[in-house]
From Swiss-Prot:
Its cofactor is Fe-coproporphyrin III. The keyword Iron applies. GO terms for biological process: heme B biosynthetic process. This is Coproheme decarboxylase. Pathway: Porphyrin-containing compound metabolism; protoheme biosynthesis. Pfam families: Chlor_dismutase (PF06778). InterPro entries: CHDC, ChdC/CLD, Dimeric_a/b-barrel. Fe-coproporphyrin III binds at R129, Y143, P144, M145, D146, K147, H170, Q183, S221. The lineage of its organism: Bacteria, Bacillati, Bacillota, Bacilli, Bacillales. Belongs to the ChdC family. Type 1 subfamily. Involved in coproporphyrin-dependent heme b biosynthesis. Catalyzes the decarboxylation of Fe-coproporphyrin III (coproheme) to heme b (protoheme IX), the last step of the pathway. The reaction occurs in a stepwise manner with a three-propionate intermediate. Keywords: Heme, Heme biosynthesis, Iron, Metal-binding, Oxidoreductase. Its EC number is 1.3.98.5.
Length: 247
């Protein structure tokens, strides 16, 4: 039996993607739509207060393509808080004109390869990655993924040292994009349909394509990677929500 990798776990994460029922939204009067937008922004302001207190973080993006219209990424210390946020949002008037498109539940995760005598939760760099302040980058790319476990290509049957070696090589590619792409990895084994969620942030959207394409040639992806649906979008600042929903 292969040895399991020890992971470090941070904030719980919810990716909530919704489509707008524009036809139904149009039936409201201008005043009714305005009230619905104000109510939604009041909820977002609560999230801003939490972020300011460094007790969580969030990101809001519009989605390009027909898969969804809006993507919310929420980070919180407990799964209960994610549930409360989702429920509060569902009770708003705006939610009556939203159609659930996709969701993903996970927890921010790092593999722990530090020496046994070092407490990773005392390392400021690790804490910043486990409890991140999500960047206000122009663009987002999110996708879930698995490690293949079929026949001879079974990631989970490989020895620990071999997995470490391959992941080190894999991570070297990612480090070449430092300053261009910010990455948040979240684990979802037992939480959702895939094993990990990968969220990328960048001001130059082409960096997503370059990074992911280059990684395709690395053995970790080429031989062992299996990927779900990709979602890509543009940042939606609070002050532009009203314009986005304007009819």
């Amino acid at each position: 039996m292969s040895e399991a990798t020890t992971t470090l776990d941070g904030w719980y994460c919810l990716h909530d993607l919704r489509s707008i029922d524009w036809a139904a939204w149009k039936t409201l009067s201008s005043d009714e739509r305005g009230q619905a937008v104000s109510e939604f922004l009041n909820v977002v302001e609560k999230w801003n207060d939490v972020a300011a207190a460094k007790k969580g973080s969030h990101a809001m993006y519009t989605v390009v393509g027909q898969k969804a219209d809006i993507m919310l990424m929420i980070l919180r210390p407990t799964m209960e808080e994610l549930n409360e946020i989702e429920t509060e949002l569902n009770k708003t008037t705006l939610a009556e004109y939203m159609v659930p498109a996709y969701s993903y539940v996970s927890v921010v995760e790092l593999s722990n390869y530090l020496p046994a005598d070092e407490d990773p939760y005392q390392n400021p760099q690790i804490l910043a990655r486990l409890y991140p302040e999500l960047p206000k980058a122009n663009h987002i790319c999110f996708y879930p993924m698995d490690k293949r476990r079929q026949g001879d290509d079974n990631w989970y049957m490989l020895p620990m040292e071999e997995r470490k070696k391959m992941m080190y090589s894999h991570s070297k590619i990612g480090r070449q994009y430092a300053g261009k792409v910010r990455q948040v990895i979240s684990g979802s084994v037992g939480f959702d349909d895939f094993e990990w969620g990968v969220t990328l942030f960048a001001d130059d959207i082409l960096q997503f394509k370059k990074l992911i394409y280059e990684m395709r040639f690395d053995e970790v992806s080429a031989r062992y990677g299996e990927f779900g649906t990709f979602f890509v979008g543009n940042i939606l600042p609070d002050e532009k929500v009203e314009k986005f929903l304007h009819i």
